[in-house]
Amino acid sequence: RADYVVSTKVGRVLSSGPELDEADGYIRPLSNKVRYDYSGDGIVEALEGSRKRLGTEYIDIVYVHDLGAFTHGADNIVHMEAFFATGFEQLIRLKEQGKIGAFGLGVNENQVCLDVLEHGALDVILLAGRLTLLDRSAQDALIQACQNAGVSLVLGGVFNSGILATGAVDGATFDYFPASKKVLSDVRRLEQKAEV
């Protein structure tokens, strides 16, 4: 077990549900109902489900998944309140109890990272799509905040949900949606530079 690292995400509690062709932006997802819960109890429930599915008691890294306005819009206020009221402290307790090794965020936006870092210390942030060839928005404030706080930054979504892998083709996606004309133009410029 010491030869590899296991990470999981919390914030979404899964239960049995009907088979669907699409749900929450996922095509043909597993037949689960998803309930967002960033409270201490919700984090424990999601973590227990992950442990059972993964067949392990110890989780090296726990990411709080999709906290932020990118996913929740105006409802994010309620989720942030639940997280700050009991979720954050629950993660600290789980780490102190030796049930997890580290915790942080797994998100698609910079601002929620900065907001949570003001509340308390994280070990790691998994940031999707904000430090890529197309989107450099994490470059200044967030990187500096992570350096100041000693927080590791893991980059995810480095292809911006597809377009940096497919190129500027019909049906290309950027941030999980069809790419705009501007993004397509930006990618074409990158492709031209890469050919030189």
Q: Residues of each region from the PLM?
A:
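N-terminal binding-site loop/beta-alpha segment at the start of enzyme catalytic domains
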Residues: R1-S16, G25
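Short amphipathic alpha-helices and their capping/turn segments at secondary-structure boundaries
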Residues: R1-V5, I43-Y58, Q139-S152
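Beta/alpha (TIM)-barrel catalytic core signal, keyed to glycine-rich beta->alpha loops juxtaposed to Asp/Glu
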Residues: L67-V196
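Short, flexible, mixed-charge acidic loops at enzyme active sites
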Residues: S16-Y26, A168-G171
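Short acidic capping loops at alpha-helix termini that bridge into adjacent secondary structure
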Residues: A2-Y4, E57-I61, G101-A102, D123-V124
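Short, acidic/polar
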Residues: S39-R53, N108-D115
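Active-site mouth loops of central-metabolism enzymes
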Residues: I27-V44, A74-M80
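Active-site groove signature of glycoside hydrolases
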Residues: G49-D75
